[in-house]
């Protein structure tokens, strides 16, 4: 039951993050509206933890394991990907054409 309450409080905190109001009453209202029975103690614990935490700031600092691209690289990435894909597609087509041609070097000719 406790993990269900923790998960409900976590989701409620994420929902309330934009309003900046993650107090006990707000957490209880959101969890009650979701149909989850959360104890006042659990909501109070989450509220006290989140009192001095900016959830949006925490979420913006989450790393997914990759290296972040440079700021200027974000706009050039789609164009670069398209440019890289074009020669690869042409090379694949050329290889396909070469495979179809009989060069006379077959093993069973």
Curated annotation (Swiss-Prot):
The keyword Phosphoprotein applies. It comes from the Eukaryota. GO terms for biological process: cytoplasmic translation; translational elongation. The keyword Ribosomal protein applies. InterPro entries: P1/P2_N_sf, Ribosomal_P1/P2, Ribosomal_P1/P2_euk. Residues 90-109 are annotated as: Disordered. Pfam families: Ribosomal_60s. One of its GO terms (molecular function) is structural constituent of ribosome. One of its GO terms (cellular component) is cytosolic large ribosomal subunit. Keywords: Phosphoprotein, Ribonucleoprotein, Ribosomal protein. Plays an important role in the elongation step of protein synthesis. Belongs to the eukaryotic ribosomal protein P1/P2 family. P1 and P2 exist as dimers at the large ribosomal subunit. This is Large ribosomal subunit protein P1. It comes from Trypanosoma cruzi.
């Amino acid at each position: 039951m406790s993990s269900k309450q923790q998960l409900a409080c976590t989701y409620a905190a994420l929902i309330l993050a934009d309003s900046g109001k993650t107090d006990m009453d707000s957490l209880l209202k959101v969890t009650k509206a979701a149909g989850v029975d959360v104890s006042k103690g659990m909501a109070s614990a989450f509220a006290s933890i989140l009192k001095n935490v900016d959830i949006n700031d925490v979420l913006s600092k989450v790393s997914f394991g990759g290296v972040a691209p440079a700021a200027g690289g974000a706009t050039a990435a789609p164009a670069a990907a398209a440019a890289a894909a074009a020669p690869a597609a042409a090379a694949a087509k050329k290889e396909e054409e070469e495979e179809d041609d009989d060069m006379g070097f077959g093993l069973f000719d």
